[in-house]
């Protein structure tokens, strides 16, 4: 299964966290460094092997159409936008343009796939308009998946992860609210 992520910020952290979790379950290919553009994504796909059960691909964009191109290459089973911010604002003519560019990630998701959207983002409605899959989950405040009972310790974080399937306690080995 291919999981593709994009967003204005937090892509690399999210990719690394998800890749770390999936690597415990099965062999997983994870985008290295910032090989997340129209040159880096094909390079990463060349590393995909038969033993990989998962691929966590970070898709970045510095121009319109780049995520459409890379999403078409990876054909994700799960695709998600982390947020719509102001990175590369000039190249896209404003946050509306950034939203359109990031939403290209849903253009090539497999028909039975799952789309993930940020519930609390100012552009959540704009993002949702681009979703083509039946299965769509939102995360964050007001979403289908959200955290409660967040406790920050000096070297770790603990919280309850609420999902449509139930609630699980999560312990992260680092401090901070992410």
List PLM regions with ranges.
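Phosphate-binding loop of NTP-binding sites
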Residues: 1-115, 119, 125-132, 163
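Adenine nucleotide phosphate-binding catalytic loops in nucleotide-utilizing enzymes
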Residues: 95-96, 135-178
């Amino acid at each position: 299964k291919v999981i593709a992520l994009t967003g204005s910020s937090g892509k690399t952290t999210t990719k690394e966290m998800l890749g770390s979790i999936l690597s415990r379950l099965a062999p997983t290919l994870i985008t290295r460094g910032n090989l997340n553009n129209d040159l880096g994504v094909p390079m990463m796909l060349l590393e995909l092997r038969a033993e990989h059960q998962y691929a966590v691909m970070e898709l970045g964009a510095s121009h319109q159409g780049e995520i459409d191109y890379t999403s078409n290459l990876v054909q994700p089973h799960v695709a998600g936008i982390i947020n719509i911010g102001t990175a590369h604002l000039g190249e896209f003519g404003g946050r509306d343009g950034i939203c359109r560019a990031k939403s290209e990630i849903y253009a090539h998701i497999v028909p039975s796939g799952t789309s993930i959207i940020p519930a609390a983002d100012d552009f959540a409605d704009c993002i949702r308009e681009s979703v083509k899959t039946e299965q769509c989950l939102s995360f964050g405040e007001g979403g289908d998946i959200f955290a409660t009972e967040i406790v920050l310790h000096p070297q770790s974080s603990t919280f309850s992860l609420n999902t449509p399937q139930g609630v699980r306690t999560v312990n992260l080995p680092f401090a901070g609210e992410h």
